[in-house]
């Protein structure tokens, strides 16, 4: 059995970007993001998790806690499993918005304690990866492919298990994320 909890983000202005970005960003295609994602994950582990545990029978072990998300949520899932690894043992990161804060992610994956029992699933679709011209074959060279593969390699170097999946013909949309999550 599994309990799945969906978290609604703010919809006014740039609230979603601020809530789902764990690092402050100034520039690039996002413009400015305040980066309160760390507060969001802290709220999940310190408050939301407790509410769920009071209402439902749960296992309190990190091995029973996973986090998943797509796009900015994929970035948050990766951040959570790295920075809050004492709470989360697994993460599904679908079409993660990684590009604008990659140096911060690399820093965290190199410096945060990561349990060897950590499993991370990274996915994307060929139709969302810039530079891919043949959408009938797996993408092995786009920027999106390279950054997901490099994060997987960093995680593996730290003893974690990392799986990557490129959905041939996949787009940056919920219908394709529904297909990608099946590999998790």
Task: Pin down the residues of each PLM region.
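Non-catalytic cap/lid and distal C-terminal segments of serine-dependent acyl enzymes
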Residues: 1-184
């Amino acid at each position: 059995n599994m309990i799945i909890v969906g978290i609604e983000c703010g919809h006014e202005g740039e609230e979603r970007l601020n809530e789902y970005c764990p690092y402050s960003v100034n520039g690039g295609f996002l413009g400015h993001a305040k980066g309160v994602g760390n507060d969001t994950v802290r709220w999940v582990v310190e408050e939301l998790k407790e509410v769920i545990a009071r209402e439902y029978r749960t296992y309190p072990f990190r091995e029973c806690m996973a986090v998943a998300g797509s796009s900015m949520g994929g970035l948050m899932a990766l951040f959570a499993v790295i920075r809050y690894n004492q709470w989360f043992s697994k993460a599904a990161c679908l079409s993660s918005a990684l590009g604008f804060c990659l140096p911060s992610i690399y820093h965290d994956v190199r410096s945060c304690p990561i349990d060897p029992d950590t499993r991370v699933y990274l996915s994307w679709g060929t139709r969302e990866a810039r530079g891919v011209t043949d959408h009938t074959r797996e993408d092995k060279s786009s920027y999106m492919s390279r950054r997901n593969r490099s994060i997987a390699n960093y995680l593996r170097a730290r003893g974690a298990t990392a799986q990557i999946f490129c959905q041939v013909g996949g787009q940056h949309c919920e219908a394709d994320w529904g297909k990608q999550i099946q590999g998790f």
